[in-house]
Amino acid sequence: MRQISVLEHGIRNDGKACVSEALGALIASLPEDTELLFPAGTYYLSRPVPVIGKKNLTFRGEGAVLMTHFSPSDDPKFNNDGFWVQNCENLCFRDFTATTDGPISCAGAVTAVDLQNRTYDVSIDPSFPVTGWEHFWGTDTCDDDGSPDYVIETYDRITRETLTDETGAERVKFTGVPYTVIGDHLIRVRAPEHCDLSRLKIGHKVLYRYIIYGNTLFGFSGCRNVTLSHIEIERCASMGAVIQPRCENFTFEAFNIRSPKGSAALYAANADGIHIVGLSGKLVMKDCFFDGLGDDALNIHSQAGEIASVDREKGVIRCIYRDRQMREQPLSPLWADKGDTICVYEHDTFLKKGSFVVERYENGIVAASSMEGVFAPGDILANEAFFASVHLDHCECRNTRARGFLLQSKNMLIENCRVYGTSLPGIIISPDVRVWYEVGPSENVVIRDCVFEKCAFIPSGACLGAVVVKSCHDVGAENYPAGVHKNLRMERNTFRNIGAGGIYISATDGVKLYDNLFRHCEKTGEPRTPQIVLCNCAHTETEYNCSDKADTLTVQYKNTL
């Protein structure tokens, strides 16, 4: 493989001049079978770097730092992604550290609470700027361990207004969380009505995300056989990696998102670590570490379709997508391709009722063949091509505002992993068409030799256990029948200090739970919390599971055989 140094082509590594354009041009000129070397230094990317149509290409850092642009106070449209990778094959990024040129959030501690006026004061750590122009997209509080505790948790509606700044120039101010600067690194914040300020204590840790969604360090579409190895992300504006259709076979080795030692930041990324929307083949993650994320460490799913109309005689099916307000939207043009098998599920039960093969797909219209079963408008659709197999091995997730791993696929093995301090379940296996329109149901899942500690600890109807298998992401589970999921095995896992029971499984046909250990797994004030709940399940086996509560029912069965 030919080796080329970026320094030989005028790419600067002083962290000052933007190298995005020059780097993009160099990459476009590279032949196949090339290793592009980034010698030690900082490479400033103020615009996305395109990597289009390349084969057998490796990007190797040699002590290199990738620094993308982020401003806590300017228009977010000027913030930057890192690399946009499209239609590539056999690609590798390895041995890089990544950060931003500005902080992605700020953090501090509560110094005063005014219940009558619904305000609270926060002393922001001196390492963060406090000018009054910083835009707070959302608020999160954390306990002493840095685990998001939802005492205050907001996603804020952003307003824009044109004001005059201290130089006399006009400037757009973005406001989500309303606050006032009342002293040196001291702010007064008005709390929304839904927040119970009586739970907020002096010294409570608070962070404000300057943005939540919108920027990705590594973005992929139409790529095959990609590896990201030994990547250390210290600051990421939104997501570390996003994988969009139609991608196939991704490996993450030592892909880490965490703040550097000594940092006052509570989040290293404002949203997901890795977000996957339609992957074929396999996903492999080994020795990855995530600490302090604004959302899930991993969410793998595909876009749910819905049948709007069907003409069986002509073999024509019109398919749509629904947004969070349940409004009809067009499906992605990459949602299906010729030869794909589409699974059809009944909307209210999520039980599979048929399938068809795509002969042609355009603008949501499918010309279908091999139609099996009876379809109707409202039925849910999942493309079987996007049920990538998943292998997570020796991965660790700590202190995420949501789940550790949200898994919506088939043939999954999760082993030797550790999850700590997730507000919601450490692992959730579930599709969702109540809010998110994500699929799909799982089959053939093994979770073994993992440790779950301090998961699902906030008061929420979504916190049913450290490992949850059901049919919607948030509240609600008991009205889905057995058979949504199939063949789940959990063995030799340890559950400690869980804010609910350890395991909650619903709507599953084929459950085997062996040798799982439970210590201090109970809801606050409910010492008889069952350690395992099996709801609407069939063909279940539970043996040699052990709890520290001898007087507590270890397994609770609800409509389960």
Question: Which role does the model predict for each range below?
Answer:
Residues 31, 54-55, 61, 83, ...:
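Parallel beta-helix/beta-solenoid
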Residues 10-11, 20-27, 32-58, 62-77, ...:
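N-terminal extracellular ligand-recognition/capping segment immediately after the signal peptide
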Residues 246-282, 310-328, 418-456, 518-544:
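Long amphipathic alpha-helical scaffold regions
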Residues 442-468, 472, 479:
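Eukaryotic tandem repeat interaction scaffolds
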